[in-house]
Amino acid sequence: MLRTHAAGSLRPADAGQTVTLAGWVARRRDHGGVIFIDLRDASGVSQVVFREGDVLAAAHRLRAEFCVAVTGVVEVRPEGNENPEIPTGQIEVNATELTVLGESAPLPFQLDEQAGEEARLKYRYLDLRREGPGNALRLRSKVNAAARSVLAEHDFVEIETPTLTRSTPEGARDFLVPARLQPGSFYALPQSPQLFKQLLMVAGMERYYQIARCYRDEDFRADRQPEFTQLDMEMSFVEADDVIAISEQVLKAVWATIGYDLPLPLPRISYEEAMRRFGSDKPDLRFGIELVECTEYFKDTTFRVFQAPYVGAVVMPGGASQPRRTLDGWQEFAKQRGHKGLAYVLVGEDGTLGGPVAKNLSDAERDGLVAHVGANPGDCIFFAAGPAKGARALLGATRIEIAKRLDLIDPNAWAFTWVVDFPMFEAADEATAAGDVAVGSGAWTAMHHAFTAPKPDSVDTFDSDPGNALSDAYDIVCNGNEIGGGSIRIHRRDIQERVFAMMGIDHDEAQEKFGFLLDAFSYGAPPHGGIAFGWDRITALLAGVDSIREVIAFPKSGGGVDPLTDAPAPITPQQRKESGIDAKPREDKPKEDAKSKA
């Protein structure tokens, strides 16, 4: 080893020892005839002092981020010179030897200052030398180990599934890889290990997991990555409660890495209740504002805006004092979310109602409104009216925005809930309008995915009454973030074919794209279920950072570009020719002889 000790490990008990440290020059300070540097490695920082002779002369050429090795004697700092901000703040190393292991060019940004994201990603290897980004990756490693430990205790088998597979409709666009040996044909990078993990259950593995890389060619969305990581799990001979129970053990171990004792079991809420109370299927439960149903209250109204299939409200405490410009800003807030506006009523300190909506209400509607929605003098009541799904979503977004503006969210709180009893299907046009990909050509598409089993009560009726069919699905939500989702899977060929047909995937297409799965279901497939955790999002929450880019070693920018390597990049004409991108696929693709040697 080029060093005897880690820089962050030295303490007063080490005084008198001769040590060799290796790391980077974080700071250099000239104090008269003495030079101090902060020497940083992965463990922390130690102060090194160069006082005399050749070692002092050599230290004059040191600059920020030079990589060095220093030998010296550990000394207790003089009284009054201690630094209580760092663990090594009571000692320093009196240098006797200095070796420059690698010089540094002038830095594109100072590591102790905040740099722009583009520069940070382009020089990510420098960015990761900083304490915050570097520790985020170290935390991620601990999180991986914690999850693996729990799953090993419960007899899970870690299995790697293919990253070169065939393109199947799973809810997003595939990244395609040309198959050079079969010109005109393409592999697809997996959007998830979903189909392979189900095949592993058919294979009798019973308990599977992997920390899986997944790929989705999606349109730009804030804080999304084209390649991301899941903790993927699947179990045979289980019901939803069994998957939830083991998932909670994983979450408890993972949150213990930051010293938080997660109380179990976690609460559960139905999808219908989550939408009704919070306007979201991933409700943030760290604060108490809830939506109020007003449809029945306004059933006889003459106000045309409220003559709608759904009318709801959310109360902003103290919101009546907002200036007109701020209230106008709420209208823009609604328009950005695809709505015409956000109606409001202001409750005066004397209880009188103001604002443009109040004058359109009847005396009876005005008299009982404050009590109905639970408002107080000085509050603002926001309304949304229209189809229930869209209006509730607007009120749910308004609820979150109110909490942010009023500072109602405790940043140190953890609020978990399972959301259960999801609809099995959603209207395809609604899915498309929300920016999702509607799989199949039917009027209905799967809300989770096509392999989610219906609840027992919906098995016989989901194709005749799709709007009321419930799936045996469950999502886990933390602080308003969906951090995992799973379900009991379909394990019967006949039910899977009915689901495909419901989604507009006909028999021939189903056989072409999913025949391998359907065939497997013909050989004694066990009941099974599982879950996939968004590992990047979970790690970001644990690290206390806003973006998943902070917990990925070499992330892409928001547009899917890697500033470090300048990927994606054009290929050469020769590469294009060799890959067979433009070739017409042969209809009689060669098949591997099952008897041939591997």
Swiss-Prot record:
Q: What is one process in the GO biological process aspect for this record?
A: aspartyl-tRNA aminoacylation
Could you tell me which residues belong to the region Aspartate?
A: 194-197
Enumerate the GO terms in the molecular function aspect. aspartate-tRNA ligase activity; aspartate-tRNA(Asn) ligase activity; ATP binding; nucleic acid binding
Q: Which Pfam families match?
A: GAD (PF02938), tRNA-synt_2 (PF00152), tRNA_anti-codon (PF01336)
Assigned EC number:
6.1.1.23
Residues engaged in binding L-aspartate: 170, 216, 448, 489
Q: Report whether Ligase shows up as a keyword of the record.
A: yes
What are the site positions for Important for tRNA non-discrimination? 31, 80
User: Record's Gene Ontology CC terms?
Assistant: cytoplasm
Q: How does it assemble?
A: Homodimer.
PANTHER family recorded for this chain? ASPARTATE--TRNA LIGASE, MITOCHONDRIAL, ASPARTYL/LYSYL-TRNA SYNTHETASE
- Function summary: Aspartyl-tRNA synthetase with relaxed tRNA specificity since it is able to aspartylate not only its cognate tRNA(Asp) but also tRNA(Asn). Reaction proceeds in two steps: L-aspartate is first activated by ATP to form Asp-AMP and then transferred to the acceptor end of tRNA(Asp/Asn).
- What family classification does the UniProt entry report for this protein? Belongs to the class-II aminoacyl-tRNA synthetase family. Type 1 subfamily.
Identify this protein by name. Aspartate--tRNA(Asp/Asn) ligase
**Gene for this chain:** aspS
